[in-house]
Amino acid sequence: MKKVTIIDYGLSNLLSVQHAFAHFGAETLVTGKAEDVLAADALVLPGVGAFKDGMAGLEKLGLIELIRQKAAAGTPLLGICLGMQMLFDESEEFGLHKGLGLIPGRVVRIPSTDVQGRPQKVPHISWDPLNPAGGRTDFLSLIHISEP
């Protein structure tokens, strides 16, 4: 089984992410070291906090270009919460900030009403299904998926 490298840039609930992958039998490495990211079979970019701070953490560790290179080379990359947001071009959170640019688009605030004008809870916090775009399952194939 391939090793899942969980990127530690200072703003993540690393233990929960590591335990989730371990539950399915995946071997994991939690690291903020460039050499470990370079050698990774698959990457997870978790995160909790503000977009600007997350990008600053990656920059401080010298990981921004490395993550872009790994993604361009086809290394599976999963962003969780803030990590997913940082995959986009930019975010409007607390000003306009550049992201990793791996997904075209801008992260914007969730509207406080739905399309019918009904109030909706913000922030949206829940467990939602993971649906890979275009039916891709390359990242999910690294771990065993089972229904509860």
Which residue stretches match the model-derived regions?
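Extreme N-terminal starter segment of soluble prokaryotic enzymes
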Residues: M1-T5
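Divalent-cation-assisted or electrostatically stabilized phosphate/pyrophosphate-binding catalytic cores
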Residues: V17
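Generic structural signal for residues in well-ordered beta-strands
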Residues: E27-T28, V107
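Short acidic low-complexity segments
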Residues: T28-A39
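Short, Asp-centered acidic motifs that coordinate Mg2+ and/or phosphate
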Residues: A42
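Cysteine-nucleophile active-site neighborhood
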Residues: G49-S126
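Residue-level detector of conserved catalytic or cofactor/ligand-binding positions
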Residues: L140-P148
